[in-house]
């Protein structure tokens, strides 16, 4: 199958959810994405803001690999975002405590296009319960889903809601993609993405990427 490498890039502006339990490999993967951001995003972001709840030593390595990252403790506000620049914002494990945050809802519903923002949510759960965040899971452009042995029902629920008619296919892809340590399934819901590239894994440049196609 011939694939245009440009079709594999994350198209700004976007929203992305990276979900999985503690220790599943979320932070490791996000660090690799940020290390390769010039190859993985189209167009390339001008500014990267990483919002965190607890400082981790791994952030220093991210900063060494990419000095353009600005780390902020807690939730970024709309006033801290320069809409004249292409912004990539990572919210690391901040969803639960900010589930009713007005800024979060405004950034999500209006931010992508109007404020020139791409949002990357790192969360332990696919579905965040809250008045301001209920729509995020069901309206995101990209999803990275790690293995969660304690709650397999989350993925089945997602498959039924987002890709009805393909539930069994997606469950099989999920099992295969998460079979290895730190394995994950990548789902692409961007409108312009070719249909045969919507379900993938190994998205980091240099990895042997895999595309799942329903027979």
Predicted segments, located by residue:
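Pre-Walker A adenine-sensing motif
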Residues: 1-10
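Conserved P-loop NTPase motor cores
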Residues: 14-39, 43, 53-58, 64-168
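An amphipathic, basic-hydrophobic helix/alpha-beta surface used to engage anionic
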Residues: 48
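Conserved GTP-binding G-domain of TRAFAC-class P-loop NTPases and closely related GTPase folds
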Residues: 134-215
């Amino acid at each position: 199958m011939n694939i245009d490498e440009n079709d594999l890039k994350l198209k700004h502006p976007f929203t992305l959810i990276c979900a999985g339990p503690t220790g599943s490999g979320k932070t490791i993967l996000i660090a690799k994405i940020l290390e390769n951001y010039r190859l993985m995003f189209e167009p390339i972001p001008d500014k990267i803001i990483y919002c965190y709840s607890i400082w981790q030593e791994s952030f220093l390595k991210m900063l060494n690999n990419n000095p353009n990252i600005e780390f902020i403790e807690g939730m970024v506000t709309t006033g801290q975002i320069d809409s004249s620049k292409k912004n990539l914002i990572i919210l690391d494990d901040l969803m639960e405590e900010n589930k009713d945050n007005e800024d979060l809802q405004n950034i999500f519903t209006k931010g992508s296009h109007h404020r020139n923002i791409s949002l990357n949510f790192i969360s332990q759960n696919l579905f965040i319960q809250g008045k301001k965040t209920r729509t995020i899971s069901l309206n995101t452009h990209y999803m990275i889903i790690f293995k969660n042995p304690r709650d397999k029902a989350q993925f089945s629920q997602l498959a039924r809601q987002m890709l009805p008619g393909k539930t069994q296919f997606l469950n099989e892809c999920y099992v295969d993609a998460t079979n290895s340590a730190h394995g994950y399934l990548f789902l692409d819901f961007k409108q312009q993405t070719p249909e045969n590239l919507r379900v993938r894994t190994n998205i980091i440049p240099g990895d042997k990427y895999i595309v799942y196609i329903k027979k």
